[in-house]
Amino acid sequence: MRSVADRVKRIGLSETYAILDKVKKMKAEGHVVYDLGGGEPDFSTPEHIINFTVSAMKNGMTHYTASKGSPGLLKAIANRLFEENHISACWDKNIIVTPSAKHALFITLMTLLNPGDEIVIPSPCWVSYIAMAEMAGAKAVDLPLTRENKYQITRKALAACITDKTRVLLLNNPNNPTGHILTEEEIQVICQVALEHDLFVVMDEIYEHIRYITAPHRSIAAEPGMFERTITVSGFSKAWAMTGWRLGYLCAPEYVLNEILKVQQHSVGCAGAFIQQGGLAALIGDRQPMEDMVKAYRKRRDYMVDSLNRIPGIECYVPEGGLYVYADIRGLGMGDAQTFTLWLLAHAHVAVTPGTAFGKEETMMIRLSFAGAMETIVAAMDSIAEAITEYDASLQQEAS
């Protein structure tokens, strides 16, 4: 039989979905499993968004929109980008609404990258970045970030990744999995290097509203000279608990956006018409539900970090944004992240994600999500601590 395309064969399945499949199997067998693997908010989509969307459907908003999106939502996005991100974007020239921020990233990379190009991606990074780059035929170049350096990008490290084949720099701010938020110094380094080497910058800002520090969010596209080379991607899934709606958007200079639009038109066509109305309701409606969710996430983050840091052998970087804690397990002496993750699922019935899902060098790190309910987090932390205590006790018995 004929084989499938090489570009698909050379990428692997998502490790986060693989863990989710294991969790579903255990639950189907009757086990109680505490799932800290995915970034799925436990909150329901705010009522005013649902009501607005249902009304739109009943009033005939069930047909195609323009491929860029509906004018109302495009204008609302442009207003938000200007007021909150200080990005001056024309609603009809610089924005495309997409069925998820993930799709926005995909069509952007398909547009920017040629086979053989290089794209620099800070590591650790979200699982799909590298797969997307490889599907475009490009080579993903790791920019290693370390916990010891607070996951900050330095000019020396970034410059060392640049070659004559480098075309794109892809960044996530706040970062998944570390929760790091770019500092002023890092922003200036990124801008300087991008301008010096004539690079495109793709900014994934899906977690921009989920922040736990007082400093306001900074968008690279708002920096001097950067709008014409920056593609900003965001969406509604995380901040508004709209993961199942699949709605995102991108903002790009017109000459780039017109090319990205071709990929949108020849793939999905447009985002769902009534789904777009849900996004409009989120942007023009009451922001209090989003702010309340962020307050709850902060409490969950604090509880999880404190609980994990109480376990001898585990150390956590306190995330400044996002929905995850990135923990160092090397002090446990219980094997690498892959081994520990499987052990944890079997003995504590807690699902977490191994660091190797976010970078091949992340062999002693695990990611835990605090997007779920506080009672789930409390039970999971107790179960982890109890399982590790029992493991240590069994080792002591064997030694004696």
Curated annotation (Swiss-Prot):
It is an enzyme of class 2 (transferase). Keywords: Aminotransferase, Cytoplasm, Pyridoxal phosphate, Transferase. Its cofactor is pyridoxal 5'-phosphate. It is found in: Cytoplasm. It holds the Pfam family Aminotran_1_2. One of its GO terms (molecular function) is pyridoxal phosphate binding. It catalyses: L-aspartate + 2-oxoglutarate = oxaloacetate + L-glutamate. Its EC number is 2.6.1.1. Homodimer. This is Aspartate aminotransferase. It comes from Musicola paradisiaca (strain Ech703). The lineage of its organism: Bacteria, Pseudomonadati, Pseudomonadota, Gammaproteobacteria, Enterobacterales.
